[in-house]
Design a protein with these regions (language model features):
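Sec-dependent N-terminal signal peptides
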Residues: 3-13
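Acidic, glycine/proline-rich Ca2+-coordinating loop motifs
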Residues: 1, 17-323
Length: 323
């Protein structure tokens, strides 16, 4: 019998909180504006994290165009959008259209193709993260070619190039059916356009899955993947705006979903915006935080609760009102 021995040294020390400083200007990030979000990944596999900044495009202001920024590993980023192959779709004249963003019959003037969200995910399992862009009226899937360039495969992959009512503010990659390939859920902020789930077929194409019976049309802003009932199948939690209940889609072993937000105590009708997962209480259970126009919420499960319901700890831990 072989034995392995480990020496353990216990050290005591005083710990101080970390200090942060704004390096926007020194990192060449301060010039970009009208930004709707950022997606982080090591797209070129060089060991450091790169950025895709998704922006509301203004034809007469190049600083408002979406950008792919490569991390130079010295505290700076360089704009590689043009050489990446993504620029062909981003740096072009965008038409102004009248659009009912909120589904309330009031039309706003927007730029067709406004970038609203970005999400990295390796949909073809080649080790290189691919990029999905959620836009107004259209969306885009870019395949990472592994050499610093991308190819627009939106059409060939089975996604709508043009969708009349869509306003995709969130894109969530997850393997909902556990077949080893990332699927994608799209949160749509237009209540006249449903949220969508696309199943990855494993051959670089996707099929649209009907989830209309479990996810009603709403002003959905974002979505995260959690394990609400502690099985192996990921569930989907959706933040909805305008006093609508948030939605919790419980995965039915990869065969469909059932909406159960009220059952789990996470309906949270406070004008949902952002979502983030964490384990704030170190119980090895996935908790999540909801940022709202109204009060924020921090949900965690009671490990002794056989019903898997959640408790909102936001007031208890002082993250209820973050200003």
């Amino acid at each position: 019998m072989k034995y392995r021995f480990f020496s353990i040294f216990l050290l005591s020390q005083v710990l101080y909180s970390q200090q942060f400083r704004n390096i926007n200007n020194t990192s060449d990030l301060g010039v970009y504006n009208n930004n709707n979000g950022v997606a982080v990944a090591d797209y070129d596999k060089d060991g450091d994290l790169d950025l895709f900044i998704v922006s509301a495009h203004s034809n007469d202001n190049e600083d408002s165009w979406s950008r792919l920024l490569e991390n130079t590993n010295n505290g700076n980023f360089i704009d590689v959008t043009e050489n990446s192959g993504i620029s062909q779709s981003l740096d072009h004249e965008i038409n102004l259209i009248n659009y009912d963003i909120y589904g309330n019959q009031i039309y706003d003037v927007i730029e067709q193709g406004d970038r609203l969200s970005a999400s990295w995910g390796d949909f073809n399992n080649d080790g290189f993260p691919d990029l999905f862009l959620g836009n107004a009226v259209q969306s885009e899937l870019y395949k990472n070619n592994g050499n610093g360039t991308f190819s627009n495969v939106t059409d060939s992959a089975g996604f709508e190039i043009y969708c009349e009512n869509c306003y995709i503010t969130g894109a969530l990659w997850l393997d909902y059916d556990l077949d080893g390939y990332l699927d994608i859920f799209l949160a749509d902020y237009n209540s006249n356009s449903p949220n969508k789930l696309y199943r990855n077929l494993g051959n670089e194409t996707f099929e649209l899955i009907d989830i209309s019976s479990s996810s009603e049309n709403a002003n959905s802003f974002s979505a995260i993947s959690i394990y609400a009932n502690d099985d192996m199948y990921p569930d989907i939690y959706i933040a909805n705006d305008f006093d609508l209940n948030n939605q919790l889609l419980i995965n039915q072993n990869g065969e469909g979903f059932i909406e159960m937000a009220v059952d789990f105590g996470v309906e949270d009708p406070y004008d949902g915006m952002g979502l983030a997962t964490c384990d704030f209480n170190n119980d090895l259970k996935l908790d999540f935080y909801v940022t709202n126009i109204k009060e924020n919420s921090l949900y965690a499960k009671d490990i002794f609760d056989a019903e898997f319901t959640y408790t909102n700890y936001s007031e208890q831990v002082n993250v209820y009102d973050t200003g």
